[in-house]
């Protein structure tokens, strides 16, 4: 009985702390046409303190969505346009010599912001990608002999073009794993496309104002961490991730030759955190299997290595995840 009372109290706190989520969604929808899943995914990454990678062809509002979200939050924002000639110092900062006092001074890079847009991250070579991804992992940056903590909250929202396009450098598996979510952006519907045309030819570019603060985001994250996950849900999450490593143990022997590696423990942690954030968005103080299923593709799609056989057969990680989710027993 006490547990149910606790859940009711938690639901009340979530209702109180999550009011800004509605305002964020309204603000996003004023600028972004459609793309409901994209907006929801950005909110999940924001609430679960997990970096997000958006993939899609140019022109699908990836950059606009991230920029709009940052404008709706009263916090520091910076944009890094990744190009082949970008240097690590252009991202994290460097030491600059001053002739006036004959000393080196630290010049901090654009990574020192609450929200960092890493635009077209796969346009820059590996050493530049590594500079940003190290900052993502450690939440600190070393310039010269000094180490500087990054601001709180610190969230990297990156975009990339599909790897088939020319002039792109594929992110290594170990680095892309640091993104909690990888969201693939699709084309809008016909009706949405017509609305996009109408808004743009009329010059109807709506400006948004901040509706919340960085402090409110941190308070909401503290509540998200209290969202209850039952042992059966923990087992469900672990089973899904284990099925990517040992599919034959879950009656999916046909997947064994299609997977070179499965999700790591980081995948399990990310799946639990994302499911909690999704429950919070739905104003619930506990996680249900539907929450896990709602986020599993975005959490897992970049954490499964496909074999040559899978690629030759045009089998995607999404198909493998769907088969696993359909097979693993739901609590």
Where are the regions that the model predicts?
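C-terminal engagement/docking regions of AAA+ P-loop ATPases
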Residues: 1-8, 14, 247-331
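Pre-Walker A (pre-P-loop) alpha-helix and adjacent loop at the N terminus of AAA/AAA+ ATPase modules
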Residues: 13-60, 242
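Conserved C-terminal "switch" segment of AAA+ ATPases
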Residues: 13-18, 31, 168, 182-254, ...
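Conserved alpha-helical scaffold flanking the Walker A/P-loop in AAA+ ATPase domains
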Residues: 41-44, 97-117
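Walker A/P-loop
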Residues: 46-83
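Walker B catalytic acidic pair
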Residues: 56, 119-120, 131
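Canonical AAA+ ATPase core
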Residues: 98-102, 120, 124, 128, ...
């Amino acid at each position: 009985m006490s547990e149910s009372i606790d859940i009711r109290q938690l639901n009340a706190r979530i209702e109180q702390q999550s009011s800004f989520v509605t305002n964020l969604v309204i603000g996003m929808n004023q600028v972004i046409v459609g793309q409901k899943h994209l907006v929801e995914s950005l909110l999940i990454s924001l609430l679960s303190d997990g970096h997000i990678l958006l993939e899609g062809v140019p022109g699908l509002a990836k950059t606009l969505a991230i920029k709009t979200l940052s404008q709706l939050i009263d916090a520091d924002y910076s944009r890094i346009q990744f190009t082949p000639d970008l240097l690590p110092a252009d991202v994290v900062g460097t030491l600059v010599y001053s002739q006036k006092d004959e000393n080196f001074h630290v010049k901090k890079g654009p990574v020192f912001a609450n929200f960092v847009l890493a635009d077209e991250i796969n346009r820059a070579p590996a050493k530049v990608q590594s500079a940003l991804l190290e900052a993502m992992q450690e939440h600190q940056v070393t310039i010269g002999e000094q180490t500087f903590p990054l601001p709180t909250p610190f969230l990297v929202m990156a975009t990339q073009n599909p790897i088939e396009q020319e002039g792109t450098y594929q992110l290594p598996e170990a680095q892309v794993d640091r993104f909690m979510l990888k969201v693939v952006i699709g084309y809008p519907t016909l009706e949405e496309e017509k609305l996009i045309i109408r808004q743009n030819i009329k010059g109807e570019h709506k400006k948004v104002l901040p509706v919340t603060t960085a402090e409110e985001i941190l308070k909401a994250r503290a509540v998200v961490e209290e969202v209850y996950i039952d042992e059966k849900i923990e087992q469900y999450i672990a089973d899904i991730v284990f099925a990517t490593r040992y599919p034959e143990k879950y009656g999916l022997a046909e997947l064994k030759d299609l997977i070179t590696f499965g999700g790591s423990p980081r995948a399990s942690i990310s799946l639990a955190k994302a499911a909690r954030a999704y429950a919070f968005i739905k104003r619930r103080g506990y996680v249900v299997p539907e929450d896990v299923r709602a986020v599993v593709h975005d959490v897992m799609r970049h954490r499964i290595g496909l074999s040559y056989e899978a690629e030759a057969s045009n089998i995607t990680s999404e198909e493998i995840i769907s088969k696993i989710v359909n097979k693993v027993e739901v609590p």
